[in-house]
Amino acid sequence: MPPLFLPSSSSALFLLLLLLLTLQTLTSISLSQPQALRSPEKCGNFSVSFPFQLSSSSSAAAFRLSCENSSTLFLHINHQSYRIIEFFTDGLLVDFPSSPSCRQFNDLRSFPFSANQFFSISFENVIGLYDCEDSSLCKFGCETNDLFGCDGREEDETSGGDIGCCYPLSDHSAWRVGDDFSVFSRYGCRGFSSWLVPRGTNRGKRGVKLEWAIPRNSPEAICDREARTVNATAIEGSVRCVCRDGFVGDGFLHGTGCLKSCFKDGKELYGDKCKIKKHNGKKLTVLAGVLAPLFILGSLLALFCLLKRPVTSHKDQQFDISTTTTTTNSVSFRKGYNKTRLFTYRELEEATKGFQDSQKLTQGKTGTIYSGNLTNGTRVIVHKVLCENQIEFMEISSQIDHLSAVLHRNLARIIGFCMDIGYNPLVVYEYPVNGSLGDRLRLGLDWCKRVNIVAEVAGLLALLQYENYPPILHTNISSGNIFLDEDFQAKVTGFGLQRKQRIDTSMYDFAVLLLEIVTGLKQREETVTQALQKIRSGKLEEIVDPSMYFHEQPVAFREQIGLVADIATRCVLFGGDGKFGMVDAARELLQIAGNNGGGGCDKKRDGIEETFSNSSLLQMISMSPDSIYLPKT
C-alpha cells in the first residue's frame, strides 16, 4: 500500500499556537522589569520583615509592632509590651517588660506571658534560677554555657556573679510548652535570669526568646513557590515559610516571597539581576525584530513538511523488525508459578487510551507507569519498561520471567505482559484499590500506616536482593511505584532493567522514600540535603508532615518518627560502603512497626507481628507462608 499523506490538524494548531506565544514573548521581553526585594520597614537599626509590620494595615494584629523614638521596637501581647533586642528567622529576643535596667535576677512573675497561636517561649532559652529549695531542678552540663551578666562579663564566681541553678527549657521535665516562668516557684525558687543559647552553640544572649509562627489554616501562612513549610517547634498547629537554598526573602506569598540570590562584582543581587546575561530594551527589540521573521519562515517550512510526511505504521517504531523477527521464539516464560497472560500491544494501547498523558501515573528511571482498563472492565497498571536495543529487550524479558516466579504478598501481582518485537516491553500489574503511596500521602495518611508500609517495602527489597539468584534490585523505588490494597498493604511495581545499578544507589532511593514518609513531600536532591541537615541539628519537628500534627502525636510515635528519620540518614551516609544495607533497614523498620500493636494503631499486620531471629536473613525479613500472595485459581 502506498504511504498515506494525511494533514495533521492538531500538529498544525500546535505550531500556530507556538508561533503566537513566541512572538508575544519576543515583543514583550523588553518591557519586563527585573525583580527586586521590596524594602522592609525600618525602625532605627531594625528591619521589619513579614509577618511583622509597623503600619496599621497589617492583616494579623498579633504581629503589629510599635516604634518609639524612631529607634526602639516593641511587641505587644495581652496588654504587655516587650522591647525587642534582636530578630531571628524563627523568633525574636525580647527584654523583660517594665524593666528599666538590667538585673542579675528577676522575680518569677516579672515576665507575664501567655502562649497563643502566634507566640510561645522558645525551647532555646536557658534559665538561671536563684535560691531554689529543690536542687533536682539543676541540670548537669548546663552551666558549661557561656552566659553573660548585665555588665557583659561571663556569669561565674570569679566575676562576682553566679547563675545559681541552671535549667535548659529544652529539658521539658519541669517546664512545658504553654507554661510561664512562675512554674519554677513549685521548686522553691525565688528569682531567675534568662539567656538564649541557639542550638549548636554554647554562647548565651541575655533576654527571652519568643518563637513566632502563623496558624496553619490562615491565609497568611501560604508559602512562596520557592519556599517550604516548616512546623513551629513550640506552637502547636502553626507554621513558618523558609526559602530554599539559593533564594532569599521571608518565604511568604503575601510578603517578599523568595528571590534568586547571587553575587556579582562583590555585590549581592536578587531576582532577574542574577541572570547570566543582561540586555537593554533596545537590543532586545532589535533581536526580536530579527528572530521573529526567521521563526515564521522556519515554522511554515516545518508545517509544510509535517503535512507532507507519510503516516508510518507502529511497527516501524523503536526496533528494526527485519532484524529481530527471528528472536521471538527465544523469549521463554516459565509457567505454573503465576498464571500470567500474554497481551498484544494493541490491547494495552487501547486499555491506556493510546498511552495518553492523562493515564500516566508516574515516570522514572525504569520507564513510565500508566493506568488502564481492559476490555472486561478490569483496572490494571501498565509499566512501559525503558528499553533501548535488542540486548536490553532480551535482558528485560528474562527478568520479567524471573520476577513472575516470585510470590510475595508485597509484590504487586503480575497479570501479564507484552513482549511484541518492535515495542517497549510492557508489564501488566493488578491495580490495588487505594492507589499509589504518593497520592495517599498527599491526601493524608496516619503514622501507623506509613511505618507499616515502609517496613513491608524494606522486607521485600531485602528478600529480593539477598535471597534470590540472580538478585533482583529495584532500580527506581519511589512512592509512585508503591501501591496500596484495601488493607493499605504495600504492593511494589516498577521493576526495570538493572543496567549497572549499585546497591548504594538503591539505598539512597530508599532514604528518599523514608524522608517522603516523614515530610509528606516529594523529595528532590536539594530538599533531601535540607531535610538531613534539619535532622542532624535536632530540628526534626520542622520538617514533619504538617498533616500528622507532630506535637499532638503520642510520645511513642514521635520517637518512631525520629527513628525512621535516623534510618534515612544512615542509608545516605553508610549505604554506599555497605556498612548499612537493606537488611539492616528492614530489621529496624520491622521492629518499629512490630511495636505498634497498641498505642493507637488498629492492629498488627500478619507479617509484621512475627518475631524475627537475627540468626537468619530469611527468618528476619521473609513473610510467613500465610502472608505470601497466591493467585486465585
UniProtKB/Swiss-Prot annotation:
- A GO molecular function held by the record: ATP binding
Protein's membrane topology? Single-pass type I membrane protein
Regions of this protein lying in the Cytoplasmic compartment: 307-633
What does the UniProt keyword field contain? Answer: ATP-binding, Glycoprotein, Membrane, Nucleotide-binding, Receptor, Signal, Transmembrane, Transmembrane helix
Gene3D superfamilies, alphabetized: Laminin, Phosphorylase Kinase, domain 1, Transferase(Phosphotransferase) domain 1
Q: Which domain of life is it from?
A: Eukaryota
Signal sequence range: 1-28
Q: Which PANTHER family match?
A: LEAF RUST 10 DISEASE-RESISTANCE LOCUS RECEPTOR-LIKE PROTEIN KINASE-LIKE 1.4 (PTHR46008:SF2)
| The protein's name | Probably inactive receptor-like protein kinase At2g46850
